[in-house]
């Protein structure tokens, strides 16, 4: 990691600016990358709390002769947001909506507000900002403006430029100017305004270059390369000087406030999923489909379909609307105000496909047809699938990845089929292939050839492919940059694309605004070579150090048994920076700090294992701080489209740190809980005094770091007893269906099952296990309670607490005991059922990763949560439970691991078996308790803040008669402490219904 250290600048910024100033190595490493393949270490980062603080920091940098890089979500794919500069991160604090004019359909915002967050605030007014880009959950308005972003529905709404009304900007000399509509003679611009001189010079340049602009600017809707000189052509009545800043990639000024044009919310829509047996046929059909005036036409190719089928969160969506094995899909959306008109257009789409000769019963290139999608929920799921396109493509686990550099070309629709065919041939010539998706409606398809940028031959191939592709685009009068901008990737090619004369004009614009290169130098003008490997994430000296890992990473390439490859799966797309919906990433949603998001942690890990953060970085205090607020919720395992499993990676970090530094007293008490619990339970009355004896809680905080503000779980003197099996009062006459097996085959059936009694329910909430036994026995099952195979008196344990503090060897020992105890039951075809999600789902995740044995894989294949097992039996018509009505409302919180393993739906399904029970799921992220995390004095504030994101307010709003349901022991504890309500396990709800 190349560094430029300026300690004097750091001291001055800290002394004179009230914002957060961070020049440490870990922070600079986290800001060294964006969603491109580049890595350039910044000088430092400033996170201003106000616009005035941002201006002050920029002024200091100007005085010190240091450039600045305004940054939003850092989701650029072309390298716009990396530079050897001081980063001005607008995304944490500069997020206010300044003005809303509902009648005028206008809004003014600060640059750091995220698009989805803005639209959430606008929704009650029936309005939205309609540039609906795929990264809307983390892209900021400032970043979108700097990039001139386009959305899937640009056929109707255009790009960002067409929706920006004005910009208040700080100029390079420190002055402020209002960029907006102006008269051609500048009569409405005061003589004293710094804008007047700039505008006069820009108009002169526009007049001089008008003919060249007319001749050289691409004639396609999607063109965001270079500066918008076409906005300066004289004789127009709609000159808006803000449009010269739009698409300027932060190279001309700093946007302080941005005024946007709004549109009415879309109403009900229809979607036609056009299937094609041949990719070229789909490309040729696009030009005909757009004549039906859809709002969007989006491509999904066979590669993306195949990859998405391997991702749990997308598999059900594909199964719902994809027929057969199409080579390509075109998703055609109609959104007129009149519903009947949408249906008529959908009918015309069917007629068009028929007229083009496509039919379901035909083979080859003429296979095809339209699947109607009218259900809004399925439409939303398809949109989620489509917007995750890049990340789905990046889920490939090989060293080669789809690389962004020719992904943004746009060509006229009549040339689209030829262009895609010829570019495919170019890829083949250079020994690779490409994956295609995105905006067929405007001829802007995102294609990324698969390359390994660690290899010199692939870097040479990248150069050759780029030159051939861009030459082809020029031949078709298209644009080499349709929506992702220039950055480092395409700035080098602006001269051949626009011609030398306009390239010089771009330099004149830059120099007029920013003569000393204060703002993001090297983008659009005077750019480096795009294949300069010294600026790559995987530079010429990139090498992962040898390391010993504890878990199985063999599905990935690289050092540490594949740990390197797993870490490198993070492509910095920033999906983990989402602020709402799903679970990922709860710590970031509280702190808004790049350190505390999955992307930031993955970057820190990558830099550490490759020696770029200095020796011993993996076990350093800085790395411990980086991992500190990760609650191991596993949301990233499911919701990160590239499958970055930070919870599992944290285990490796904890293990390495524990091996080097040992454990604190608090960590020992947490990790060894299963070992001392049998003895502690005998002193339950004494241990429980901690919460009632004056001063005891504060003493425990001082000695072991358990917060005095948090109650501790109550030990039970009468613990759950597993000395005898439970026979069903009415044994089932029929066996259950075949269970799963690790090899995919069927095992023998059994009406007997095994209950795993976890440490938490055994010693703190035995009523849950008692209720589960009652329910299962009443349903006709013979229940075996799992006991050690060697006859030991020490109960079984999944090893979860040991893993949480990095004691992997101890966890492996517990896992081996558990697998041995359950092996004979699994071999006899019995399901293994657990109540605590983090324990039983560990059977499917960490235990196979630790033991790497066939017995562990067989156990994983037959381990179920309590609700999963009952839901499966109910769906098959085999569940026999005489449930009585409960005419109440049940508010249900899903455990993070249930959501990560798609097990939460079973919770809702089982509760709905209770007659008259009204079941409602809480749309919540992590509860924030996360085992010991919520008890620790140094993390309790973040723990409670996570709960306040959605869970605790929802519980407080619930009526006193509402049943609060939560399967996780930590979740129940958080609800108790944070909302003063008692939550219960599903097993107790069902037992109540049986009473």
Give residue ranges: language-model regions:
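Iron-sulfur cluster-binding electron-transfer modules in prokaryotic oxidoreductases
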Residues: 514, 521, 528, 647-735, ...
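N-terminal glycine-rich flavin-associated loop
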Residues: 13, 36-68, 86, 90-135, ...
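Flexible inter-domain linker/hinge segments
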Residues: 117, 189-233, 353, 513-586, ...
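Ferredoxin-type iron-sulfur electron-transfer modules and their immediate structural context
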Residues: 395, 399-400, 475-480, 487-629, ...
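A glycine-rich phosphate-binding loop feature that marks nucleotide/adenosyl-phosphate handling sites
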Residues: 27-30, 76-79, 135-142, 221-228, ...
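Terminal amphipathic helices with adjacent charged low-complexity linkers/tails
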Residues: 258-265, 283, 291-400, 434, ...
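C-terminal substrate-binding/cap subdomain adjacent to the FAD-binding core in PCMH-type
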Residues: 36, 146, 154-385, 421, ...
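N-terminal flexible segment immediately upstream of the FAD-binding catalytic core
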Residues: 1-63, 73-105, 134, 157, ...
């Amino acid at each position: 990691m190349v560094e430029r250290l300026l300690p004097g600048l750091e001291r001055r910024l800290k002394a004179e600016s009230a914002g957060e100033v961070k020049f440490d190595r870990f922070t600079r490493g986290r800001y060294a990358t964006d969603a491109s393949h580049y890595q350039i270490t910044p000088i430092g980062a400033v996170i201003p709390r106000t616009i005035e603080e941002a201006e002050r920091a920029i002024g200091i940098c100007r005085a010190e002769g240091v450039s600045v890089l305004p940054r939003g979500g850092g989701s650029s794919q072309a390298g716009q947001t990396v530079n050897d500069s001081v980063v001005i991160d607008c995304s944490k604090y500069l997020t206010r909506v300044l003005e809303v004019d509902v009648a005028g359909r206008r809004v003014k915002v600060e640059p750091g507000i995220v698009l989805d967050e803005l639209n959430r605030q606008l929704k009650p007014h029936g309005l939205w900002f309609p540039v609906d880009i795929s990264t809307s959950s983390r892209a900021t308005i400032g970043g979108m403006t700097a990039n001139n972003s386009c959305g899937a529905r640009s056929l109707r709404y255009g790009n960002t430029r067409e929706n920006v009304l004005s910009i208040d900007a700080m100029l390079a000399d420190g002055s402020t100017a209002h960029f907006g509509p102006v008269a051609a003679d500048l009569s409405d611009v005061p003589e004293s305004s710094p804008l007047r001189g700039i505008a006069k010079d820009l108009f002169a340049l526009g007049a001089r270059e008008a003919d060249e602009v007319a001749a050289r600017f691409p004639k396609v809707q999607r063109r965001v390369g270079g500066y918008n000189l076409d906005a300066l052509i004289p004789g127009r009545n709609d000159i808006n000087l803000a449009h010269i800043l739009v698409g300027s990639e932060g190279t001309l000024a700093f946007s302080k406030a941005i005024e946007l044009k709004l549109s009415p919310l879309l109403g009900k829509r229809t979607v036609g999923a056009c299937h094609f047996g041949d990719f070229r046929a789909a490309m040729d059909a696009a030009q005909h489909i757009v004549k039906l005036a859809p709002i969007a036409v989006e491509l999904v190719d066979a590669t993306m379909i195949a990859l998405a089928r391997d991702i749990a969160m997308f598999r059900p969506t594909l199964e719902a609307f994809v027929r057969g094995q199409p080579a390509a899909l075109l998703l055609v959306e109609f959104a007129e105000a009149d519903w009947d008109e949408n249906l008529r257009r959908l009918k015309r789409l069917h007629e068009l496909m028929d007229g083009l000769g496509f039919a379901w019963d035909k083979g080859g290139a003429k296979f095809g047809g339209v699947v109607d999608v009218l259900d809004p929920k399925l439409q939303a799921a398809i949109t989620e699938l489509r917007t995750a396109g890049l990340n789905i493509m990046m889920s490939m686990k090989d060293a080669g990845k789809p690389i962004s550099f020719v992904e943004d070309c746009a060509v006229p629709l009549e040339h689209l089929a030829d262009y895609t065919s010829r570019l495919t041939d170019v890829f083949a010539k250079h020994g690779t292939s490409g994956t295609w998706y995105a905006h067929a409606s405007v001829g802007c398809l995102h294609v990324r050839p698969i390359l390994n940028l660690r290899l010199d031959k692939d870097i040479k191939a990248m150069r050759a492919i780029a030159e051939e592709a861009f030459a082809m685009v020029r031949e078709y009068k298209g644009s080499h940059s349709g929506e992702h901008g220039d950055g480092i990737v395409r700035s080098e090619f602006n001269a051949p694309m626009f011609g030398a004369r306009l390239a010089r004009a771009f330099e004149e614009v830059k120099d007029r605004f920013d003569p000393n290169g204060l703002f993001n130098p090297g983008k659009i003008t005077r750019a480096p070579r795009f294949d300069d490997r010294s600026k790559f994430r995987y530079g010429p000296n990139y090498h992962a150090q040898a390391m010993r890992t504890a878990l199985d990473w063999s599905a990935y390439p690289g050092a540490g048994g594949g740990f390197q490859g797993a870490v490198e799966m993070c492509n910095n797309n920033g999906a983990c920076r989402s602020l709402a919906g799903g679970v990922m990433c709860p710590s970031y949603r509280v702190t808004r700090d790049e350190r505390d998001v999955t992307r930031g942690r993955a970057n820190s890990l990558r830099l550490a294992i490759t020696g770029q953060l200095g020796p011993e970085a993996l076990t350093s205090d800085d790395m411990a701080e980086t991992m500190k607020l990760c609650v191991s919720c596993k949301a990233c395992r499911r919701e990160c489209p590239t499958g970055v499993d930070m919870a599992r990676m944290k285990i490796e970090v904890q293990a390495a740190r524990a091996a080097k530094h040992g454990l604190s007293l608090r960590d020992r008490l947490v990790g060894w809980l299963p070992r001392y619990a049998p003895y502690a339970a005998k002193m339950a009355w004494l241990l429980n005094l901690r919460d009632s004896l004056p001063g005891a809680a504060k003493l425990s905080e001082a000695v072991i770091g358990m917060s005095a503000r948090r109650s501790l779980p109550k030990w039970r003197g009468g613990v759950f007893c597993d000395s005898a099996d439970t026979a069903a009062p009415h044994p089932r006459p029929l066996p259950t269906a075949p269970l799963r097996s690790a090899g995919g085959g069927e095992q023998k059936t059994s009406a007997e099952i095994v209950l795993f009694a976890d440490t938490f329910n055994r010693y703190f909430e035995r009523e849950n296990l008692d209720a589960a036994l009652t329910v299962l026995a009443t349903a006709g099952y013979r229940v075996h309670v799992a006991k050690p195979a060697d006859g030991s008196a020490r109960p079984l344990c999944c090893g979860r607490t040991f893993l949480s503090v990095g004691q992997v060897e101890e966890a492996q020992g517990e896992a081996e005991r558990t697998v041995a105890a359950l092996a004979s039951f699994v071999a006899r075809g019995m399901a293994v059922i657990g109540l605590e999600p983090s324990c039983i789902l560990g059977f499917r995740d960490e235990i196979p990763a630790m033991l790497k044995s066939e017995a562990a894989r067989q156990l994983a294949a037959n381990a179920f949560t309590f609700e999963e097992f009952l839901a499966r039996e109910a769906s098959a018509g085999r569940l026999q439970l005489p449930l009585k009505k409960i005419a109440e409302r049940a508010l249900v919180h899903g455990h993070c691991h249930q959501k990560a393993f798609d097990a939460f739906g079973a919770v809702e399904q089982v509760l709905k078996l209770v007659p008259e029970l009204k079941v409602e799921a809480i749309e919540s992220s992590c509860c924030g308790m996360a085992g010991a995390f919520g008890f620790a004095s140094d993390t309790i504030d973040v723990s409670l803040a996570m709960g306040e994101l959605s869970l605790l307010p929802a519980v407080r709003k619930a009526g006193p008669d509402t049943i609060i349901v939560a399967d996780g022991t930590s979740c129940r504890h958080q609800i108790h402490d944070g909302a003063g309500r008692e939550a219960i396990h599903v097993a107790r709800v069902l037992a109540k219904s049986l009473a």
